[in-house]
């Protein structure tokens, strides 16, 4: 956004939280989902979306420590199965390529309970960690902006794990599926633990809307007859929405494969101007009229 976020914001502001889809990668500010929805409904939408490998752990931290302090009475939470189950699971990021990926990850400490940790938390030279993380992050962002390698980083990590046979690394993404058809239970449990934590922290709001966002690959799989609604992640997120009194809104129920192809950039799958606009219009029609 290009406006200050402070205590003078309207009390009926809406928090938007998520990754690069929420931030609006690929379009100008005025064409992002948040800006379009704001103009459509006449209410301030505070955009707390963030690109660069941002998952449920960071989103929970961001809301708890910053966004929750601002005036608002509703939340829109973007959830992307294609990314959100692996962003904060260290097993997916342990190759040498990701040695200095300084991000918060989850780890299980007891049944149904997780904590946040940083991979370099025992190293005393925090400046060196930050410097290496910054350099690595810049390389990643250049790869994402100017090549088709956003997901290639994960692919390299999986291949590294496969050939080195590291036991604490996910050996292949194929057996775990992808996106709407992802079925790594450990990754699902850890990720959704923090999604639920985020929603519970927003329990005082008038409404919490969870928007599940598919990818083109998900539509291809659905077109070929695959069904995801009996998989663990979907059943779990349905249960969480009920437990937190949130509304679950699955975009895959409202678009066809051919529709989606017109809504995204061919280079990376983020919404184009039309995609941001049509999704904002759909959200308005269903929840703000």
Residue ranges of predicted features:
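Short, amphipathic alpha-helical "lid/cap" segments that border enzyme active or binding sites
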Residues: 56, 60, 188, 192, ...
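Catalytic His-Asp segment of secreted/periplasmic serine-dependent ester chemistry enzymes
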Residues: 217-222, 227-289
